[in-house]
Amino acid sequence: MIRIGHGFDVHAFGEDRPLIIGGVEVPYHTGFIAHSDGDVALHALTDAILGAAALGDIGKLFPDTDMQYKNADSRGLLREAFRQVQEKGYKIGNVDITIIAQAPKMRPHIDAMRAKIAEDILCDIEQVNVKATTTEKLGFTGRQEGIACEAVALLIRQ
């Protein structure tokens, strides 16, 4: 059996902390306003794999009302979500992530993001694609108020 899931996440800029995207610290003058580390790419991916396995979403598994997830490392959240997906008998077919940001530029960091994601979801780096786009200065991402991300995940029954 093959299953597909879609995830989406958005975070606004505004906190004095590192900007983490795809598990990688991206140099920038501000970080995200978020309960966890705010990693939009890993949050979207976590939702995609949970959705594909019919396990709900990141908010169900790791509610932002629970202080144990305050400033949580999103790589740990992704690994736990994937562990639950594996328990249902699935492995990754492939994942595809689109980061939507006017700034900062993602290209220099994409290979590192792919490597960390592949490590976390126990697959080959060739099964992980990360790309970035802008909104041509339109909307909140175009005004550099934050970043959005979409992800899809294909799961295969083991």
Curated annotation (Swiss-Prot):
InterPro entries: MECDP_synthase, MECDP_synthase_CS, MECDP_synthase_sf. 4-CDP-2-C-methyl-D-erythritol 2-phosphate binds at residues 9-11, 35-36, 57-59, 62-66, 133-136, 140, 143. Pathway: Isoprenoid biosynthesis; isopentenyl diphosphate biosynthesis via DXP pathway; isopentenyl diphosphate from 1-deoxy-D-xylulose 5-phosphate: step 4/6. Its EC number is 4.6.1.12. The record marks H35, T134 as: Transition state stabilizer. It catalyses: 4-CDP-2-C-methyl-D-erythritol 2-phosphate = 2-C-methyl-D-erythritol 2,4-cyclic diphosphate + CMP. Its cofactor is a divalent metal cation. PROSITE patterns: ISPF. Coiled coil: none annotated. HAMAP family: IspF (MF_00107). Belongs to the IspF family. This is 2-C-methyl-D-erythritol 2,4-cyclodiphosphate synthase. The lineage of its organism: Bacteria, Pseudomonadati, Pseudomonadota, Gammaproteobacteria, Pasteurellales. The gene is ispF.
